């Protein structure tokens, strides 16, 4: 779908399930569709720009509605599995079937239960049937291809034994290796090895004591320049960057407005903060604006005092949906209602934007409009850890108040060097164009892979520019079947079901990489097509008409005069 003539590229298109657009951003303000149409007629549309240039891409996200028959059959499938689960529990109770799962001791029957009834039931009767699809051990670099250690289970997936065989050259469609820096050769590896010889593997101290290396300060200065912010701070763990820093930013008397599909690290951080939490519908600006209005009008519960702070939590790319945050509209609402914005760019930094600077650059926005810019080094940079960027006052405050900064040990020196070298490569400071080529290759792979899957008839979620590609499976039996069939064909994929997704929205999640060649993608697509026919997964009623292959070039992000 393309925007109307004269329309803004950031307009949200109508979803395949019939959901309508929630309005548009025009000149920094949220305007209704009617107002936007009137402005367009008057020739007053102001496009979102990047450094004075026009961002011309349509903002297309597809969330096709689950076909009614598929939804019914999915519920029936869960019903049958539940029925057999109760039957097996009955057999276990009478010692007819061997019991492998953890049970409460009779002596502790009056204690608070360690296991919630439904979760325990789901784990032993549904999850165990397909447990072999997760926690598969690999024994190689997580590049475009990986080696997987083969294992077997003789007790219905309650335990596994290694066979000693190695499945070689499995196409890796599951790792977050977006720019292909997860490798054991090249400049990054050589630089990390050199630093390992000089500094060793660990620091054995916190930053505030004797664990603050010159490499750490070099990294933080580089991250700040990369993001276009005043200062930045690096942390040893991406998950802890969220969960340990949010409590330092807000507390009792503050309000957190969180997207309903935010990552578990954001959810945990919000809960640990002690602030009041309210949830808005995923990427829905009407829902967010209503919560903002209510927060200002009604204030805190009981006392009706104004909130000390209102913090909006969003992600750049949502890792289960493949959707991209509607950042221009979030920023417009944040400014309008004087809230703060916390942006998690774990999946979007390096993967979006003409030069890989994330969702802020993708929309051509000013980094200063985002109060807290968070991201991780675990994905596009092929390393570990996370960062927070923003104003110098913010970073100075976090250095003394963040649990992750004060109590956690510092990043490993070779890991720091891996991040520095890969980031300089992306920025072009290594004297080559390799980084830019990787960003371009990822964008090309993303659009090609998504388009081909839609042409085959699969239901694909998310934004067309997102390298996270969810393929909907729906039925519980097809979760395990898809993962096993793909591995038989030497394709490693991630399959996801409840409770990580809604109960009828099980899916396979592909993560694309700049390391994937067209031959690798074509091989994977061929096998996906065959498995899709075998398992009858082609549910889409909006199959795309195949197009001629068109190369991805710089005109995709063409800058023009307004």
From Swiss-Prot:
Result of changing residue 176 to A: Loss of catalytic activity with L-serine and palmitoyl-CoA as substrates
Pfam families from the UniProt entry: Aminotran_1_2 (PF00155)
Domain of life: Eukaryota
Induction: Expression at protein level is highly increased in brains of patients with Alzheimer disease. No changes are observed at mRNA level.
Keywords on record: Acyltransferase, Disease variant, Endoplasmic reticulum, Lipid metabolism, Membrane, Neurodegeneration, Neuropathy, Pyridoxal phosphate, Sphingolipid metabolism, Transferase, Transmembrane, Transmembrane helix
Cited InterPro entries: Aminotrans_II_pyridoxalP_BS (IPR001917), Aminotransferase_I/II_large (IPR004839), AON_synthase_class-II (IPR050087), PyrdxlP-dep_Trfase (IPR015424), PyrdxlP-dep_Trfase_major (IPR015421), PyrdxlP-dep_Trfase_small (IPR015422)
Single annotated GO MF: serine C-palmitoyltransferase activity
Membrane association type: Single-pass membrane protein
Residues the record lists as N6-(pyridoxal phosphate)lysine modifications: 379
Gene Ontology BP, a term: sphingolipid biosynthetic process
Activation and inhibition: SPT complex catalytic activity is negatively regulated by ORMDL proteins, including ORMDL3, in the presence of ceramides. This mechanism allows to maintain ceramide levels at sufficient concentrations for the production of complex sphingolipids, but which prevents the accumulation of ceramides to levels that trigger apoptosis.
Residues spanning the membrane: 67-87
Subcellular location(s) of the protein: Endoplasmic reticulum membrane
Known catalytic reactions: L-serine + hexadecanoyl-CoA + H(+) = 3-oxosphinganine + CO2 + CoA; octadecanoyl-CoA + L-serine + H(+) = 3-oxoeicosasphinganine + CO2 + CoA
Phenotype when changing residue 126 to W: Some decrease in catalytic activity with L-serine and palmitoyl-CoA as substrates
Reported impact of residue 479 to W: Loss of catalytic activity with L-serine and palmitoyl-CoA as substrates
GO cellular component, one term: serine palmitoyltransferase complex
Medical condition linked: Neuropathy, hereditary sensory and autonomic, 1C: A form of hereditary sensory and autonomic neuropathy, a genetically and clinically heterogeneous group of disorders characterized by degeneration of dorsal root and autonomic ganglion cells, and by prominent sensory abnormalities with a variable degree of motor and autonomic dysfunction. The neurological phenotype is often complicated by severe infections, osteomyelitis, and amputations.
Family membership: Belongs to the class-II pyridoxal-phosphate-dependent aminotransferase family.
Protein name per its UniProtKB record: Serine palmitoyltransferase 2
Source species: Homo sapiens
């Amino acid at each position: 779908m393309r925007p109307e003539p004269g329309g803004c590229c950031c307009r949200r298109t109508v979803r395949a399930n019939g959901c309508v657009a929630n309005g548009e951003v025009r000149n920094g303000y949220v305007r209704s569709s009617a107002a936007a149409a009137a402005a367009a007629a008057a020739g007053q549309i102001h496009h979102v720009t990047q450094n004075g240039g026009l961002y011309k891409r349509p903002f297309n996200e597809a969330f096709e509605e689950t076909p009614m028959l598929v939804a019914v059959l999915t519920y029936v499938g869960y019903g049958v599995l539940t029925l057999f689960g109760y039957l097996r529990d009955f057999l276990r109770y009478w010692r007819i079937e061997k019991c492998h799962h953890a049970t409460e001791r009779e002596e502790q029957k009056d204690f608070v239960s360690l296991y919630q009834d439904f979760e325990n039931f789901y784990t032993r009767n549904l999850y165990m049937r397909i447990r072999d699809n997760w926690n598969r051990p690999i024994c190689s670099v997580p590049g475009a291809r990986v080696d997987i250690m083969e294992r077997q289970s003789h007790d219905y997936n309650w335990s596994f034994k290694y066979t000693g065989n190695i499945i070689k050259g499995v196409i890796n469609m599951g790792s977050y290796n977006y720019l292909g820096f997860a490798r054991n050769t090249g400049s990054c590896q050589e630089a990390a090895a050199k630093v390992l010889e000089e500094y060793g593997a660990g620091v054995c101290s916190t930053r505030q004591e004797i664990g603050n290396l010159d490499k750490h300060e070099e990294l933080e200065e580089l991250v700040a320049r990369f993001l276009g912010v005043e200062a930045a701070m690096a942390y040893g763990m991406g998950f802890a960057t969220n969960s340990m820093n949010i409590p330092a930013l807000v507390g009792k008397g503050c309000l957190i407005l969180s997207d309903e599909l935010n990552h578990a690290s954001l959810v945990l951080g919000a809960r640990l903060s002690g602030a009041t939490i309210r949830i808005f519908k995923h990427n829905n600006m009407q829902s967010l604006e209503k919560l903002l209005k209510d927060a200002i009008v009604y204030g805190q519960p009981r006392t009706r005092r104004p909130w000390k702070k209102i913090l909006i939590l969003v992600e750049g790319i949502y890792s289960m949906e493949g959707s991209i945050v509607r950042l221009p509209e979030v920023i417009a609402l944040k400014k309008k209602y004087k809230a703060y914005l916390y942006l998690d760019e774990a999946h979007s930094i390096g993967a979006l934007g003409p030069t890989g600077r994330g969702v802020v650059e993708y929309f051509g926005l000013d980094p200063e409009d985002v109060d807290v810019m968070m991201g991780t080094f675990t994905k596009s940079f092929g390393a570990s850890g996370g960062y927070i960027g923003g104003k110098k006052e913010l970073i100075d405050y976090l250095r003394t108040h963040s649990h992750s900064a004060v109590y956690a040990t510092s990043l490993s020196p070779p890991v720091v060097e891996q991040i520095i070298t890969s980031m300089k490569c992306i920025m072009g400071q290594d004297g080559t164009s390799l980084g830019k080529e990787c960003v371009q290759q990822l964008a090309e792979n993303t659009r090609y892979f998504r388009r081909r899957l839609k042409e085959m008839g699969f239901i694909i979620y998310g934004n067309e520019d997102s390298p996270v590609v969810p393929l909907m499976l729906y039925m519980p039996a097809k979760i395990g079947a898809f993962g096993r069939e793909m591995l038989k064909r030497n394709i490693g994929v991630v399959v996801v079901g409840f409770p990580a997704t809604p109960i009828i929205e099980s899916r396979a999640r592909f993560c694309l990489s700049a390391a994937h060649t067209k031959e690798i993608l074509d091989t994977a697509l061929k096998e996906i097509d065959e498995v899709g026919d075998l398992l009858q997964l082609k549910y889409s009623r909006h199959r795309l008409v195949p197009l001629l292959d068109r190369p991805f070039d710089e005109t995709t992000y063409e800058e023009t005069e307004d």
